[in-house]
Regions:
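Conserved N-terminal entry element of GNAT/NAT acetyltransferase domains
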Residues: 1-8, 131-137
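Acetyl-CoA-dependent GNAT
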Residues: 6-53, 63-64
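Conserved acetyl-CoA pyrophosphate-binding loop and the N-cap/start of the following alpha-helix
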Residues: 66-74
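Conserved GNAT acetyl-CoA-binding A-motif
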Residues: 80-91
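Conserved catalytic-core motifs of GNAT/GCN5-like acyltransferases
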Residues: 90, 108-123
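Conserved active-site alpha-helix within GNAT-family acetyltransferase domains
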Residues: 94-111
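C-terminal "cap" of GNAT-fold acetyltransferases
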Residues: 116-137
Length: 137
């Protein structure tokens, strides 16, 4: 059984930080954790909220928690609670699993930051609310 942790963002962030790449801005963030048998197995970290956009990073050590109901929950948080019109992600070009996941969720490749992950490029992905297949219209 998976338990969603929404009220302990600092513990979730401490678990996720060593597993994340890039220059994440931790000043204002939200983090949801996913526990199995009392151990964190996944986290979704939201940073760089601008009102219209929010950056998302996903960390997992066990994909058992990645189900439709949790995906829908995350999109509802971004688009309904935060009121964003888009969601963004930045991924190392060598992270094929994350790229496949983002494309499967409906994200579109929007650009490339050359040598962002020294020496690898960063690929910028985005998704508009109007493109989101996970929310009811």
């Amino acid at each position: 059984m998976i338990e969603v942790i929404t009220d302990d963002k600092h513990r979730v962030a401490e678990w996720a930080k060593p597993k994340l790449e890039g220059n994440i801005q931790w000043a204002n963030f939200q983090a949801f954790g996913f526990e199995r048998h009392g151990d964190l197995v996944g986290a979704v970290v939201f940073t760089e909220y601008t009102g219209n956009d929010i950056h998302v990073s996903v960390v997992t050590t066990d994909p058992c928690w990645w189900h439709r109901r949790y995906i829908k929950l995350l999109y509802e948080y971004v688009f309904d609670q935060c009121g964003c019109i888009r969601i963004s992600a930045l991924v190392n070009e060598s992270n094929r699993k994350s790229i496949k996941l983002l494309r499967g969720l409906g994200f579109k490749e929007e650009g490339r930051l050359r040598s962002y992950f020294n020496p690898k490029d960063g690929i910028v992905f985005g998704q508009l609310r109007s493109e989101c297949k996970w929310l009811e219209r």
